Design a protein with these regions (language model features):
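Acidic, Ser/Thr/Gly/Pro-rich intrinsically disordered interaction regions
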Residues: 1-71, 100-234
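Short, hydrophobic, well-ordered secondary-structure elements
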Residues: 69-92, 120, 124-127
């Protein structure tokens, strides 16, 4: 029969094991990514709606609430992306300093992308101004619609450096923010996967050790069940 003295040390080791924090934070990061993925699909769905060109298209779009709904979904996505980036920063500082440098490089790699700079610039603007200055743009030639922002409209007072950093590489006077989000999504996915990979590689020994301890606990529970059956039979 398994004694309590034999069981207690392994339970204590599991409760205080350093890999538990890594696994918990990794799971939170996965949940945040899943939520962002859902926000991305919501934005992608409305962006791909077949809304044909029509007379007075701007007025028709506004009447249908299309502009408002795109703005709402954009704002939701941009907020979620910022939260994902902030959560990765927490992983750098809160799970183990050994992660800090490598996770920062993962973030830096994402931030170097032109589409990342533009998308995060939109988030920065929306954070301060609440609403993106979307305008309906139609093309009679292509018989299509899109919602765009004029680059100059994103220029906030006293933010010349931030404006150049986020939008200085855009050559046209306007752009479709939803298209930039969609183009940027593969880089978001890479950022997420690289973050997970860094955590798993650097904490591999600790995670494996915790998994081994968990297996030993399962075996103990099986032994306890067997001990209980023996007692019932006496």
């Amino acid at each position: 029969m398994t004694s309590e003295d034999e069981r207690e040390p392994i339970f204590e080791r599991i409760r205080g094991h350093e890999a538990r924090d890594v696994i918990d934070e990794r799971q939170k990061f996965r949940w945040r990514h899943t939520t962002l993925l859902n926000d991305f699909h919501d934005l992608q769905d409305i962006h791909e709606l077949d809304t044909p060109h029509a007379t007075e298209r701007t007025q028709q779009l506004e009447t249908q609430g299309y502009v408002f709904e795109v703005e709402r979904r954009l704002h939701h996505y941009l907020s979620g992306l910022y939260t994902l980036l902030q959560q990765q920063r927490t992983l750098q500082n809160g799970v183990g300093q050994s992660f800090g440098e490598d996770l920062q490089e993962v973030k830096n790699e994402y931030m170097r992308k032109e589409s990342s700079r533009a998308v995060l610039g939109l988030r920065h603007y929306a954070q301060h101004e609440n609403v993106l200055p979307l305008q309906a743009r139609t093309s009679k030639l292509e018989r299509s619609k899109s919602l765009v922002v004029m680059v100059d409209d994103l220029h906030r007072e006293d933010d010349d450096r931030d404006f150049e950093q986020h939008f200085g590489h855009i050559t046209k006077p306007y752009f479709d923010p939803s298209e930039w989000v969609i183009d940027n999504w593969p880089d978001v996915e890479q950022f997420f996967e690289d973050t997970i990979e860094v955590m798993e590689q650097q904490a591999e020994e600790e995670i494996d050790e915790l998994a081994q301890l968990s297996e030993e606990v399962d075996e103990l529970y099986e032994q306890l069940a067997e001990d209980y059956r023996e007692l019932q039979e006496e």
